[in-house]
C-alpha cells in the first residue's frame, strides 16, 4: 500500500452518485407538431415528469392542463370533451378555459367563490410557433421570463421542407445539453479528426457557440431549444433541436433539418444535402460517427459526477453548469392540509 495521501472521497464517491440528480428545469418545451392536434381533440401527454391533458378548442386555441378536475379529481383526459373554448370534465361537466378558470358548473345555483378569484386547475402557458406547440414550465407557476426566438428557416419561404428525427435517451436534459460544450468527446467518442477550436459565450438564458472557425455556429435558448447553422463553401444548412424533458431521467431529442432551395443537381444543393447528412451522422465518407450510434451508449449508462476531475483540454463544462443552474427553480412548499 502506498504511503502517499489518498483522496478516498474521489475513489469511493461513485457508489453514491445519482444518474439524474436534477429537477425539471424552467423553460420553453416542445409539446407536439401543430399538425398533429386537430380541433376539438383531447389527448393525454407525458411531459415534464407528469401527465397533462392537451386539447384544441373550436377556435383553434391550444390548452395544456393538469388532468385532474378540481371538483372530485376525475381525469379530464379520459372522457373529457371540448365544448366551444372550454375543456369539459366527464364526471359532472365542470368546464375550464385554457387558463384553468372554471367557467361553468351546469347544476350549481351559485359558483364556488374561489372560481371568480383565480384559476382552479393548473395550466401551462402555450404558444404555437414555427408549426410547433410549445409550453412554458416553471415549478412555481411563474410567467415566462423570455420569449421564443425567431427562426426564419421554419417560417420564411425559400427553404426545403424539414427533415425530422426523434430519439429518446435515458438521461436528464442537462446531460444532453452539456455535450454541446464537451468538444474533446468529438474526437475520442465520435472519431473526429481532431478537437475543434471553439468559442462559447453566455448571456442570460442564451448560450452562443462558434465551433471550428465558423463551420458550426448557433445559439441555445434555455434547456429546450437550440438553433445551429453548419456552413461550408458559402452554403448553410440549419439544425433546430428541441429536446423534451419527459421525466427527470428520460429526454426525447427532436430535430428538424433544412436549407435553402437550390437548383436540382447544383453543387450548392449537393453540399447542403451533405451538411444535413453530417448533422445526422449519415454522410457518405463521414470520418466521425453520428450521435445516435455513440452518444446514447454513454448517456444511457453514465452517472452525473458533480465534482468532475477535468484537465486543461476540456471544454467550458464548469462554466456551462454554472450557467445552467439558473433554470433550476424551487417548487413552492405546500401545507399538508
Language model: regions and residue ranges:
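A generic structural signal for short, non-catalytic loop/turn and secondary-structure boundary residues
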Residues: 22-24, 47, 119, 128, ...
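Sequence-level motif detector for i,i+2 pairs with an aromatic at +2
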Residues: 25-28, 40, 121, 130, ...
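C-terminal catalytic domain of Rieske-type non-heme iron oxygenases
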Residues: 61, 141-337
Amino acid at each position: 500500500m502506498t504511503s502517499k495521501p489518498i483522496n478516498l472521497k474521489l475513489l469511493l464517491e461513485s457508489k453514491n452518485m445519482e444518474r439524474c440528480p436534477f429537477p425539471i428545469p424552467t423553460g420553453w418545451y416542445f409539446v407536439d407538431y401543430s399538425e398533429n392536434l386537430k380541433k376539438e381533440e383531447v389527448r393525454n401527454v407525458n411531459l415534464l415528469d407528469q401527465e397533462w391533458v392537451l386539447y384544441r378548442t373550436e377556435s383553434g386555441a391550444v390548452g395544456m392542463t393538469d388532468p385532474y378536475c378540481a371538483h372530485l379529481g376525475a381525469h379530464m383526459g379520459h372522457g373529457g370533451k371540448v365544448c366551444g373554448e372550454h375543456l369539459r370534465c366527464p364526471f359532472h361537466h365542470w368546464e375550464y378555459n385554457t387558463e384553468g378558470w372554471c367557467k361553468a358548473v351546469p347544476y350549481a345555483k351559485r359558483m364556488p367563490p374561489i372560481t371568480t378569484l383565480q384559476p382552479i386547475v393548473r395550466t401551462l402557458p402555450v404558444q404555437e410557433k414555427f408549426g410547433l406547440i410549445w409550453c412554458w414550465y416553471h415549478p412555481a407557476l411563474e410567467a415566462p421570463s423570455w420569449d421564443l426566438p425567431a427562426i426564419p428557416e421554419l417560417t420564411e419561404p425559400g427553404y426545403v421542407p424539414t427533415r425530422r428525427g426523434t430519439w429518446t435517451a435515458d438521461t436528464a436534459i442537462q446531460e444532453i445539453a452539456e455535450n454541446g460544450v464537451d468538444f474533446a468527446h468529438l474526437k475520442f467518442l465520435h472519431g473526429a479528426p481532431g478537437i475543434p477550436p471553439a468559442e462559447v459565450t453566455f448571456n442570460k438564458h442564451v448560450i452562443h457557440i462558434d465551433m471550428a472557425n465558423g463551420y458550426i455556429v448557433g445559439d441555445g435558448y434555455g434547456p429546450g431549444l437550440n438553433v445551429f447553422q453548419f456552413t461550408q463553401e458559402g452554403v448553410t444548412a440549419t439544425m433546430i433541436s428541441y429536446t423534451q424533458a419527459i421525466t427527470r431521467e428520460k429526454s426525447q431529442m427532436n430535430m428538424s433539418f433544412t436549407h435553402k432551395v437550390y437548383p436540382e443537381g447544383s453543387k450548392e444543393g449537393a453540399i447542403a444535402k451533405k451538411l444535413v447528412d453530417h448533422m445526422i451522422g449519415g454522410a457518405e465518407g463521414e470520418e466521425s460517427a453520428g450521435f445516435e450510434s455513440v452518444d446514447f451508449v454513454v448517456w444511457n449508462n453514465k452517472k452525473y459526477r458533480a465534482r468532475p476531475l477535468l484537465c486543461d483540454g476540456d471544454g467550458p463544462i464548469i462554466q456551462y453548469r454554472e450557467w445552467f443552474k439558473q433554470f433550476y427553480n424551487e417548487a413552492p412548499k405546500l401545507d399538508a392540509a
